[in-house]
Structure formats: structure tokens, C-alpha cells
Amino acid sequence: MTQINENYLKLKAGYLFPEIGRRVKAYSDANQNAKIIRLGIGDVTLPLAPTIVNAMVDAAKEMGSAGGFHGYGPEQGYSFLIQKIIAHDYTARGVQIAEDEVFVSDGSKCDCGNIQEIFSLDSKIAVVDPVYPVYVDTNVMAGRTGEVGPDGRYANIVYMPATEENNFEPDFPKEKADIIYLCYPNNPTGMVATKARLTEWVNYAKKMGSIILYDSAYESFIQDPEIPKSIYEIPGAKEVAMEFRSFSKTAGFTGTRCAYLVIPKDLKGKTKSGEEVSFNSLWNRRHTTKFNGVSYITQKGAEAVFSAQGQVEIKEQISYYMENAKLIREGLVKAGYTVFGGTNAPYIWLKTPRGLKSWEFFDELLGTAQVVGTPGSGFGPAGEGYFRLSAFGKREDVISAIERIQKM
């Protein structure tokens, strides 16, 4: 009989969001008249902006003509989109990025999960705790993490706790880590990193010979002009960091699928013999081998995001979600909850009341208020006793959810 990859058996039972779905379904089946409000998974609710839709319609019509048909495109992405990405997201901030340093993909989740393939299995990873589960689970699948202990932590992962005590600003790894995962604005805590703190991270990575995997999927929600939107705003970051970006939350592409990864050519690793190798070239080889590229229609829609009218429309949507965040945050504070995040990110991180465990509060919130959120413990051991609410709901649902919570 063919053997399996036993690393999959090391995964904790059930991915966080399917488990939420299972519990919600069980409750819904037993309470069919319940009006459940979902503020859990970070899926957007507003439709695609008109400028994006029009661009995709035009692209679809192009594809229906002999002269405008596009078959396989460049796996790394079409130049028309990459040039807009560079001009808007980097050149405008004084950062120089070359076209062949940008890789367009169908989502940051895929990129964050797949990037570990170009690192040695001996590489030690460090993650902030609580953490987006994909960073950990994909390394478990690869065989890099060892076994999970009774405390929920994997033996070969360096955990960097982000707690109320350290203002959710984790200390540097206590032992050398080859790969450091950072996410700002942070999922799940909603916190951000200042320029001074990011500078410290870049300097630390240089000193230790580490690589930072910087997940910047929520940068468009930053309201404070003093907070960096890209790690490359920090001098020297191109020598130590890769950056993950997404159109999912920025422009409502959760169902359309488009993102990009920046890997500077200055970013190098080494072989066992000490030879330097470009991570850019390794990823290019991996990307072109395993990925056929994002569709032409989708990339034309993404290009429209950077048009003048496209920017107006997506900023209106971002403002809508951030107003939701404000309503959630203020409503929870009024109800007596201890709350974090929600000012430069679409996530609100709250302390569970009465010392409840995260899943206990999940069940209480669902059973009493018919509101669904995300248990903090699902993001790691340091998330126990916390809970995440998302600002991506419809306004009327957000208002109703807060009213229900305040009555609990």
C-alpha cells in the first residue's frame, strides 16, 4: 500500500475556519429560525467597484474576438499590471522595485503557504503568537516543525508571544530563526508596526542572517500616515524581506483572486557549500513550474484598481469597512469589553469576559446573540482568552450584532 505524507497527521484537528463552519451549521440546523450574523471569516461583503467590473467586462469581450483573444499569459503576470503596481505601491513611496521582482498570483494565502518550498527543511521558522494559521500549517505539512506539544506549540517553531502585557508587540526570537513571519496590519490582533519598530526588525534580520516574510495584505486599511505601508520603506529591507500583497480586501477580490509577491533580487540565500543563490530566481523557477498565471480578465480588473476612478471607488469601500470597525470597537467598549485593534486594520481583537476560554465565548456568543466571531485560540496558544471580530460585514448586520452583544 502506498505510504502517505505523515506530516499531515501532525496538524491540529480541523483547520480553524472549517471548525467554525461546523459549529455554526450544527447550531443553524437546530435553530432554523435564528438570524445568524457572521463577523468571523474576513470575507468582504461589498460588490466589486463599477470601474473594476467594467474593465473585466471589456476584457471578456476582448477574449471573444479573434484579435483580442489571450491564451496562456506570462506566469509572473502581465506587464500592464506589474507596472501599475510598482508605480502606485512603491515608486510613489520612494521605493525602487523592478518588474522582474513582482510575481502576480491568485492569492496571498497561496503565496504565504507555497513560499516555504524554496527554503531548506532544516530552516527554523519564527511566528508571532497569535498567528495566521497558514504560516504554521504549511510548514507542518512540509515536515519542518516537529511534533505538537501539550501546550499547542510545535517543537521546532520559535514562538514570539504578542500579548496585552507587551502591547501585542512581540520581542525578537529567543533563538536564531532563519525565517521570520510578520503580518502588519496584523491578523488577528489588528495592531500595526511603527517605522521605528520595522527598522529594528530589519536590522535584527541583517544581524542574524534571517529572512522576513512580510504579509502586508491589509496595508490599505492603515489610516495613520506615519505608519509604513511597505517594509521596503525601511532602508535595507530589500536585502532581508519578501513582501506579500493582495487585492482581496483592498478591492474586494476575495472571489476574483489576485495578489502579488515581491522578492527583490538583492535577497540571497546559500547552499550547504556556502554558494549564494537568489531567492528571486528560485521562486521564479517554482512559480513558472507550478502556476499558469492569473487570467487576463482578472488582471485587467486589477489594473483598473489603480485608475483614478478605481482609487476613488475602492477608498470608499475601505472607508465603509473602517466605519464598521469603529462601530464595533466603540460598541464593545461601551459594553465593557477590553478591545484592541480596529483603528488601522479591519479586525477587532477583544478580551473574552469573565475569564472564558475562546471557544467557550464563541459558543456563548452564538447561542445567546447569534453572532459568529473567531476564537483567538485558533490563532495560537497566546490567543487563548481573546476573540476576533471582522469589520467586513454589512452595516446593518454590524449595528445589529453590536446591539445584541450589548444586551448579553
From Swiss-Prot:
UniProt-recorded Gene Ontology molecular function terms: L,L-diaminopimelate aminotransferase activity; pyridoxal phosphate binding
Pfam families: Aminotran_1_2 (PF00155)
Keyword match Transmembrane helix: no
UniProt xrefs under InterPro entries: Aminotransferase_I/II_large, DapL/ALD1, PyrdxlP-dep_Trfase, PyrdxlP-dep_Trfase_major, PyrdxlP-dep_Trfase_small
Binding-site list for pyridoxal 5'-phosphate: Y72, S108, K109, Y132, N187, Y218, S246, F247, S248, R257, N292
Record's subunit section: Homodimer.
Protein name: LL-diaminopimelate aminotransferase
Species name: Leptospira biflexa serovar Patoc (strain Patoc 1 / ATCC 23582 / Paris)
